[in-house]
């Protein structure tokens, strides 16, 4: 049996034959190097948060308020980090969270395909965004046998929503993640300062311009055939923007649940009452997240919301993201009750540094650190990693 921590031995072994790492090993260095590699507009979009970015910073700081209590003499030579979710075996309790501009983070402009390829090689599941350069069908092919999930920005037009859902089903996605907190754009000073919003420029809209329902409605609206969508991305962007502004309701979730057998996961849940109602409505998963502090400033760190959301969700799996920067953060979120933990900015920086290989390196580095922490601290599997393993440091 191999452990994720073996990546450490691989790196040291290469050093013995004179091969030094070409990619940095820590979040701070990933970010610093990526800042030199990315265009200003992409960098501001990925790095920025809402308002004065207090919530974004608080997401990260929250992890420092908890420490893992070590247990000795536990025979943790081998660790099992696999997890069963929605009928699929995940090789690790970590996933690539959806990022709308991940395509633009890679030097070749195809970071979404690169993410799926890294997913296939590592076994770390990928949640692909509706906003992508590659089509959702192509991205699913790149992910291979690794579980993959489609994230939906729910449009106000149900015909279009159903079209996306049917396409995801036919492409072989293993579940549907509905984002709840991005029906309107948060106040993001970094982007506003340079008047930059990539999607209004027609970027990352491939899933829309290739969709038959979108094409039909666009033609009825403008008289332009589908070919015109590809030739004039600004026209497509204007029409796309008009589809936003619909705040997702419980009735919408009931409707989605009625038309698909795919597992349905709700992203953006932070209040325990919302988690309870979601479970009662029949959804298959809860995704505790505050969008990395990108949508609403002045809120709680997502980690502070996690324990109550987990408790309210009962046996329903709970995914988590927001503020993950290290393998230690991954371990702490799992101990707080997350079924699996999503990374966002770390793999965006990886895409900037080395495309698919950079993303793979980031994932393997985080999982190696998490695995080695569990080894040193005496936790052999995820069942042993509970909230009782944590102590407050403040």
UniProtKB/Swiss-Prot annotation:
GO terms for molecular function: FMN binding; lactate 2-monooxygenase activity. SUPFAM superfamilies: FMN-linked oxidoreductases (SSF51395). It catalyses: (S)-lactate + O2 = acetate + CO2 + H2O. Its cofactor is FMN. It is an enzyme of class 1 (oxidoreductase). Its EC number is 1.13.12.4. FMN binds at residues 98-100, 129, 151, 179, 267, 321-325, 345. The active site is at residue 291. This enzyme proceeds along a 'coupled pathway', wherein rather than releasing the alpha-keto-acid as a product (in this case pyruvate), it remains in the active site, and after reaction with hydrogen peroxide undergoes an oxidative decarboxylation to produce acetate, carbon dioxide, and water. Homotetramer. Catalyzes the oxidative decarboxylation of (S)-lactate (L-lactate) to acetate and carbon dioxide. Its physiological role remains unknown. This is L-lactate 2-monooxygenase. The lineage of its organism: Bacteria, Bacillati, Actinomycetota, Actinomycetes, Mycobacteriales.
